[in-house]
Amino acid sequence: DWIGAAIPLFNSAEIIRWNCRKTYLRTLEERGADLIPTVWLDDPSGVDAAGLFDALDTDRLVFKRQTGGGAHGQFRLRRGEALPQMTQPMMVQPYLQTIEREGELSFIFIDGQLSHALLKRAAPGDYRIQSLYGGTETAIEANNADVNAARGILETLDQLPLYARVDMLRGNDGKLLLMELELIEPYLYPQEGPGVGRMMADALMKRL
């Protein structure tokens, strides 16, 4: 906060602090964003695994830390498997096969305008799309419906961020669902969108 009080800060300290923990997704859902169904485990000790499968109506789950990135501490679980010990607040979602069939869609926005979009695919046999695990990224021409779905996420915010990456996964019904809204220090994939640097500079100058 003291840095933001001394100099212009984009994105703002307020929005960065809010974005640090994935519970921000709950706020976005309350404002109308379409999310993957999620159970929040603020205290994961003594969790009934069978109850989670039943609550989310699935036989495969994904567990993610509420604070963290890069799929660190993330794991999948099938119904009947032993639940590993968890020591941090977690979020639990049904495992969607679309991560394997299509992949994750990322939309890069600068000051509310789309810079570029890309498709991130996991390595064969994996579901994590990060390059650390063998994932790949490819620039795509996203259709208007998908771009509007991603832009709609930004429209739920109290303030328009200078930069944002909206990561989405298609549900079984074909609708895009929000996975992450990256507002702190997202990688903006300049190789897939070489114009993003100029776009960012122009947007920043308009704000100063």
For each of these PLM feature ranges, what is it?
Residues D1, W18, Y24, W40, ...:
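Tryptophan-centric aromatic hotspots in well-structured domains and transmembrane helices
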Residues W2-A6, A13-E102, N144-V147, L208:
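Active-site nucleotide/adenylate-binding loops and adjacent lid/helix of ATP-dependent enzymes
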Residues I15-W18, K120-A122, L169-D173:
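Short glycine-enriched loops at secondary-structure junctions
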Residues I36-P37, Q93, S115, A164-V166, ...:
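A short, local hydrophobic-aromatic micro-motif
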Residues V39, Q66, Y95-L96, I108, ...:
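Anionic group-transfer/hydrolysis microenvironments
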Residues T67-D158, L177:
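Phosphate-binding site of ATP-dependent enzymes
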Residues N144-L208:
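ATP-dependent carboxylate activation and anion-phosphoryl transfer catalytic cores
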